Amino acid sequence: MKITLVSSCGLVLEQDGSALLIDALNKQFRCYYGLPPEVFAKMLAGEPPYDAVCGVLFTHAHPDHYSASRTEQLRAACGAPVFLPQPNTPERLMMQLGPFTVECSRFPHIPVPGMAEAPHAVYWISAAGKNIYVTADAQIDTERHRTILHGRRADAAFWNGQYLSHPETRELLLEAAVKNYIYHIPVDEKDVCGIRRKCERSMARFGAELPDVSLLEQYPSSLEA
């Protein structure tokens, strides 16, 4: 499975000629990297790998993860199903989108002062024997993650940088996946919000105990699972 980070938390998963988008239709918001207009234009035009988009998923509706206008434009262009968690979304929901089996689990958002609460979910995504765990802005709750994982270990997992800051979350990373990626990292030159510096300091301090953890600081970044 090919995985491409196209924006702050925007992932494109490719398998068997199909593409699944997760949090990929955001716009620039504060210090967070938005999907470039030229990439969005390729999506609308159906240029590869966007010629067979089988689904568009969002973890929540905050603007660094979701743009309603871009979502409606892409839905009109390609007809792919769109899923955004709602207040009445079940605690656990299964979906089949092309070759991807998607397990959606409700999970509260990390508290952010001044930011409205939004229904939030994490995703366990399987295709062709590979498993991906996408956590976006899930609050720090290791036991809830363990309940969702239920002893499973992903081939790749994607985490907010705050998961580097606590001993219990660093331990979780080692359990949760073969390869762990810290994403949602700003690329503004001055790093006004300080998130990139904090992630880099954490890796400098704890990297020896996290051999299978990498920072995703380049857009786009391409990976294989």
What do these predicted ranges mean?
Residues P111-A176:
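Active-site-proximal loop/helix segments of hydrolase catalytic cores
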